[in-house]
């Protein structure tokens, strides 16, 4: 999972891109990068770390130009600690291309071999985003054949990308001297929207909050399979480039990943989480009598709307029992299980008075590996709770995700091939209540805002095992596991600077 942004303007864009990336920081904390363009020349800075740490004043001054793009990275393939795999990625032909990508390709290995043997292109990293960039570059080269580039050529190239690439991808690319290109996979698994400023500036971003927070008016979502091209005069061109597009956004965006003040594909993330709390309340009643619960406490922060709604419906007190250290990243998206476990107590501290002598119902947005949940239950008991009940606003995560969330291996999922009671014993809580899959889908779908069409399908593969692209086999999942983020020790990774430094690593 990553956050991406692109800006086309008649004024410098470096500060705009920086501000938008800050608003998308929750989508990735591993690395950040920005590219701008002036006089057909790209200027790039990228490195490991948070946005505020990667970009200093001197870096911002070296990013001139009225067009650019950026990314905050959360690795789902390749090496989690490699600075070389920070985005944007660059290739010099045709024209000069830079690209940022949110998602995960399910056929990256086959494409990489095809690029080498047939297209005669070299891939220097383990990142599927570099593969995607080279596919786009080849399709553009094949389409233009040395002739001037037109919007029709761009859309024809994207059609070629859709034919070759499988999986999830929201993409923003900059074509030197020509303009800004954005497109989504034919299933719209990863979000992408566009907005416009009062001065005519266009901004593309993963979430609407990046538009609103930088004073851009939300215009619309990029449709599944659609491509948008903004030329150097900031004229917008768009075309549907997929044969049979079908909107199936990732439901985990609404459960956990997106900011609550965002709207994705017309669905309010905040309202979706309220709805999830409402349906979860019904599940709680069937498992634990509300009279046996003294207080409802959320696990900060994504679960707060669901927990508050649940408490209100059950007529129970809602209290903040955990204080979050905001300077520690989101534990779910930290690379490496050992790093996640260590960070739980660094991230959360209990307010003991809310637990002592009480039966507490803890509400979390989801339970993936169980590492965080077990630590939190133990913290509640140490604070004096008599009984600790755990409720998840999402159903059990039983299946690997192959579309860009860092949970691909079955062995890492606490719910895989286990009953709810077996999971309860692992987490060590007194009762465990999960959301229902169908209820979750309905709750999220019913959060659509007025004026937007209802979403009829979701990618909920980590919950129901149904892969919406229809081309993912057990063998594919095993192959993808081989290329998931390396979990090598970070100190070891920091000392490994031996790889050849090419433009993609600058």
For each predicted feature, which ranges?
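Short, glycine/charge-rich flexible loops or terminal/linker lids adjacent to PRPP-binding catalytic cores
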Residues: 313-360, 371, 398-408
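Extended, hydrophobic alpha-helical segments in both membrane/secreted and soluble proteins
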Residues: 296-299, 303-310, 314, 318, ...
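Phosphate/diphosphate-binding loops
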Residues: 160, 209-210, 214-226, 282-283, ...
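PRPP-dependent phosphoribosyltransferase catalytic core
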Residues: 162, 177-179, 184, 200, ...
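Flexible loop/turn segments at secondary-structure boundaries
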Residues: 12-14, 76-77, 107, 180, ...
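Secondary-structure transition/capping motifs at alpha-helix termini
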Residues: 121, 142, 286-292, 312-321, ...
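Conserved short alpha-helical segments that host acidic/polar catalytic motifs at enzyme active sites
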Residues: 1-224, 229-294, 299, 387
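A conserved beta-strand->alpha-helix junction
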Residues: 55, 130-135, 318-329, 426-444
């Amino acid at each position: 999972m990553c956050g991406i942004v692109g800006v086309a303007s008649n004024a410098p864009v470096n500060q705009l891109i920086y501000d938008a990336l800050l608003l998308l920081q929750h989508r990735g904390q591993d690395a950040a990068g920005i590219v701008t363009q002036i006089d057909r020349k790209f200027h790039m800075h990228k490195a490991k770390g948070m946005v505020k740490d990667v970009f200093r004043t001197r870096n911002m001054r070296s990013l001139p130009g009225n067009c650019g793009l950026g990314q905050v990275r959360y690795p789902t393939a390749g090496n989690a600690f490699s600075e070389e795999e920070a985005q944007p990625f660059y290739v010099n032909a045709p024209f000069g291309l830079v690209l940022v990508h949110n998602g995960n390709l399910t056929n990256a290995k086959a494409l990489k071999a095809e690029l080498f043997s047939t297209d005669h292109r070299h891939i220097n990293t383990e990142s599927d985003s570099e593969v995607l960039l080279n596919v786009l570059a080849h399709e553009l080269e094949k389409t233009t054949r040395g002739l001037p580039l037109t919007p029709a050529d761009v859309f024809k190239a994207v059609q070629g990308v859709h034919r070759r690439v499988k999986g999830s991808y929201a993409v923003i690319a900059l074509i030197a001297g020509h303009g800004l290109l954005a497109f989504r996979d034919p299933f719209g698994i990863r979000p992408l929207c566009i907005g416009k400023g009062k001065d005519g500036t266009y901004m593309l971003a993963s979430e609407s909050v990046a538009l609103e927070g930088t004073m851009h008016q939300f215009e619309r979502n990029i449709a599944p399979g659609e491509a948008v091209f903004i030329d150097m005069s900031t004229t917008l061109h768009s075309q549907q480039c997929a044969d049979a597009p079908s909107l199936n956004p990732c439901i985990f965006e609404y459960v956990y990943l997106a900011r609550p003040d965002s709207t994705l594909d017309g669905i309010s993330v905040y309202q979706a989480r309220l709805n999830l709390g409402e349906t979860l309340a019904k599940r709680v009643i069937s498992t634990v009598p509300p009279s046996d619960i003294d207080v409802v406490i959320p696990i900060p922060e994504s679960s707060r709307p669901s927990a508050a709604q649940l408490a209100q419906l059950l007529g129970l007190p809602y209290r903040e029992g955990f204080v979050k250290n905001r300077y520690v990243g989101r534990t779910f998206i930290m690379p490496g299980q050992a790093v996640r476990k260590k960070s739980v107590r660094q991230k959360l501290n209990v307010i003991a008075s809310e637990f002592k002598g009480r039966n507490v119902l803890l509400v979390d947005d989801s339970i993936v590996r169980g590492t965080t949940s077990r630590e939190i239950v133990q913290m509640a008991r140490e604070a004096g709770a008599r009984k600790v009940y755990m409720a998840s606003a999402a159903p059990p995560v039983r299946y690997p995700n192959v579309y860009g969330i860092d949970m691909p291996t079955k062995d890492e999922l606490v719910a895989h091939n286990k009953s709810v009671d077996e999971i309860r014993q692992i987490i060590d809580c007194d009762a465990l209540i999960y959301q229902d899959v169908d209820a979750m889908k309905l709750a999220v779908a019913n959060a659509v805002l007025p004026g937007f069409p209802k979403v009829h399908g979701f990618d909920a593969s980590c919950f129901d095992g149904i892969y919406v692209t229809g081309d993912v086999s057990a063998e594919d999942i095993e192959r993808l596991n081989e290329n998931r983020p390396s979990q090598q020790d970070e100190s070891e990774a920091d000392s490994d600077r031996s790889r050849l430094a090419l433009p993609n690593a600058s």
